[in-house]
Amino acid sequence: MDTTNLVRRDIVIGSRRVSNYWWASVLLLGGSSFLVVGLSSRLGFDLVPFLPAGDIIFIPQGLVMCFYGLVGLVVSTYLWLTILWSVGGGYNEFNKQEGVMRIFRWGFPGRDRRIQLTCPLQDIEAIRVELQEGMNPRRTIYVRLKGKREVPLTRIGQPLTLAEIEKQAAELAGFLQVSLEGF
């Protein structure tokens, strides 16, 4: 039996998006620069030669720069840890051979780090696409289960183009042999 047509697995990137790498790096650089300039204003000499702090009075400017620097470093650390732990990353698997749908995501470290939803394929009634345009556009593919429960499948972040979401939803509905709703 050919198992390549019986299993469909879609990888979900989660927090390891390019934008998260960008913002974590910018916040790390900016936060550490603010903190160094604030500390330099307190100590009275430049800790780093290319970040002069001679004209900055510690109270209030230097103190505020230290505060903003610490906030930037805390947010940057949070972003780097979510990237390291791959929070939100995982996969959507539809296995006709076993007759199950598995949705797996990584969470934050702890007791419930591994988040997994498993249900029989026969419980899937339809694939639904939600398109919301405007200031905050949302294009999401849902699996509708018996009992009108809906499980989102698409990743958070940049919305997919209309053609991409149409193609993904149609391929998934064709693979599962269920109806496609919501266009």
From Swiss-Prot:
Q: Which top-rank group of organisms is this from? A: Eukaryota
**Gene Ontology cellular-component annotations:** chloroplast thylakoid membrane; photosystem I
Q: Where are the transmembrane segments?
A: 21-43, 58-80
Please report the record's description of how this protein sits within the membrane.
Answer: Multi-pass membrane protein
Keyword set, alphabetical order? Chloroplast, Membrane, Photosynthesis, Plastid, Thylakoid, Transmembrane, Transmembrane helix
Q: Where in the cell is it found?
A: Plastid, Chloroplast thylakoid membrane
- What is an annotated GO biological process for this record, any one? photosynthesis
Identify the HAMAP family for this entry: Ycf4
What does this protein's UniProt record list under function? Answer: Seems to be required for the assembly of the photosystem I complex.
The entry sums up its family as follows:
Belongs to the Ycf4 family.
Protein's UniProt name: Photosystem I assembly protein Ycf4
Species whose genome carries this gene: Nephroselmis olivacea
